[in-house]
Amino acid sequence: MDETGLNGDNLVLAKAVNRIGDSVREAVETSMKDERLKADLITNVSHDLKTPLTSIINYVDLIKRERVDNPKVQEYIEVLDTKSQRLKQLTEDLLEASKISSGNIVLHMERINLVELLNQTLGEFSEKFEQKGLISVVNAPSQAVYVLADSRRSYRVMENLFNNIYKYALEGTRIYIDLGFTEWKSADGSGSQAGVFLSLKNISAMELNVAPEELTERFIRGDESRTTEGSGLGLSIAKNLTEAMNGMFEISIDGDLFKVVLVFPKMDDVKPQTEV
């Protein structure tokens, strides 16, 4: 606030307002600096872990190919394999979350067939779902449905959502998967536009004592006892990536029913671009 020409109480008030403004500005700058430092630290640590972790995974793979007769040693190898793969996933999740929060993520937007991506992901998870007796009930068009998105990041979103189902769905239940067309508000709020939605519903194996919006916060898990393996980053990454690609991501909970809905603009209603 310009203090020129002010005096008395007005000058005192102006100085107070300016001090508050300066304090807020300093706090914001400090917070942004802390966030950058935090993001840089996570990125550097993740990169530093990557090389030795890759070596461990490769050596475990070589050991698994050897003839090992001792059952106890075989058990140790399996545990080592599982834990190293989990650490690899956690490292990748941390790196992805860091890129998103720091704004260092580069998106390669292109024409994506969402039906094809859904079928591909379903095929890759079919064996895992069978192990838990999970039955997929799919309602999707047989023809191609196109959206504008980043291919690799779209798969990451889908993979995270299906991983979440695999970890937390009640065994022997159905998973309802719907893909279709809808109307939704445009990004600038100026009106509605044609969109493509993907809805995933499953029954949770445990009570969901958490608000839907909290499930997309980092390191928050529906399994408070942490008896299942996970980083607590999967849904957060899925939401942030979806929104970075101009999509909508929404979670709803009704008792033990968990539902997530994604919406993307139809390809006809968006202008193609190569990078963001």
Give the role of each language-model region.
Residues 207-221:
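Short conserved segment of the HATPase_c
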Residues 172-193:
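Short beta-strand/loop element within the Bergerat-fold HATPase_c
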Residues 102-107, 146-149:
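Conserved micro-motifs of the catalytic ATP-binding
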Residues 246-254, 259:
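Glycine-rich ATP-binding loops of the HATPase_c
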Residues 164-166:
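Short helix-loop "hinge" at the ATP-lid/N-box region of the Bergerat-fold HATPase_c
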Residues 108-122:
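A conserved beta-strand-to-alpha-helix junction within the catalytic ATP-binding
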Residues 108-112, 130, 135-145, 182:
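Conserved catalytic submotifs in the C-terminal HATPase_c
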